[in-house]
Every structure is written in C-alpha cells, then in structure tokens.
C-alpha cells in the first residue's frame, strides 16, 4: 500500500490518480480470510439493494471475526450514515481512521457527517486531512475551497 499512496500523492494525471485510488480500495477490501470476505461481500450486496440494516449486521459479523478490518468499519459507517445514524457513523469513521490513518474515504465520510450536522470547521478538517493524502483530487479541492469560503478560512 505504501507505494500506491506515494504514487497517489505525487501524480497529477487524472487517469493514474483514479487507477491508484481503485487499487487502494481493492487492497483495503482484501483480508485473505474467506469467512470475513464472505460477510463483507454480502454486506456490499445488501448496500446495493439499500438494505442498510442488513449491511450493518453483515459488516459487524466481518468485524467480529477480524477486528482490525478497517474497510468493514468504513462500510458500516457508510451504512449508518445512509440510515441517518450520524453518531454511529462517526464512531465507525474514527475507528477506521485509527486503523488506517490514510483512509481518505473515511475522512471524506467524516466530512459529510460533519456537514450534515452543520459543523463546517470539522468538515474542513476532514477534507484537508484527505487532501494531505491525495492532494490532486480536484473534487476534494473544490469541496475544501467551498468549506473555506463558508468558514472564512484562507488557503495558506
């Protein structure tokens, strides 16, 4: 993963950036533990059909078997977010980041939770942390700029 993150930090090529992001996501989702992978895959399937409560249960099963599986926490956070459970979602975002500090997906998820609750400064902190990992993501740059405008913060 370190090589992917180093390349992600350095690239300005949009195609390479998206390829690297996808490779990182694939690496985050791999555990080499069949039962864990099965629960995770079933959770992803449940999310595809908007059965977020089932997804939460399945991701929890994966976490019970593999407590260090950051991506299971991240997807459970996403499921909670989609159900409007912001406290539970933010709790899982924090665990995800504790397990994988470079988890730009969890950081951006944290920003969404913060925005939904009106915590613009916290949202900006999450987005800026994601940009430290992936500084050339144009969408995140725009989000950060808008949040800075909302908070009156200058980009230094």
Regions found by a protein language model. Give the residues of each.
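Terminal, low-structured helical/coil segments at or just beyond the last alpha-helical repeat
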Residues: 19, 26, 30, 125, ...
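Helix-start (N-cap) detector for alpha-helical repeat units in TPR-like alpha-solenoids
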Residues: 36, 70-71, 104-105, 138-139
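Canonical positions in the second alpha-helix
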Residues: 61-62, 95-96, 129-130
């Amino acid at each position: 993963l370190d090589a992917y993150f180093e390349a992600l930090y350095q690239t300005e090529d949009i195609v390479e950036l998206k390829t690297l992001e996808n490779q990182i996501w694939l690496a985050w989702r791999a555990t080499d533990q069949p039962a864990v992978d099965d629960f995770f895959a079933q959770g992803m399937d449940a999310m595809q059909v908007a059965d977020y409560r089932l997804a939460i249960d399945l991701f929890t099963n994966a976490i019970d078997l593999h407590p260090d599986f950051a991506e299971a926490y991240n997807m459970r956070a996403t499921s909670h977010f989609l159900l409007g459970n912001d406290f539970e979602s933010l709790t899982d975002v924090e665990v995800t980041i504790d397990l994988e500090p470079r988890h730009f997906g969890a950081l951006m998820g944290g920003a969404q939770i913060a925005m939904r609750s009106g915590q613009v400064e916290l949202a900006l902190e999450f987005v800026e942390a994601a940009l430290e990992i992936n500084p050339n993501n144009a969408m995140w740059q725009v989000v950060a700029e808008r949040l800075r405008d909302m908070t009156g913060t200058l980009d230094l």
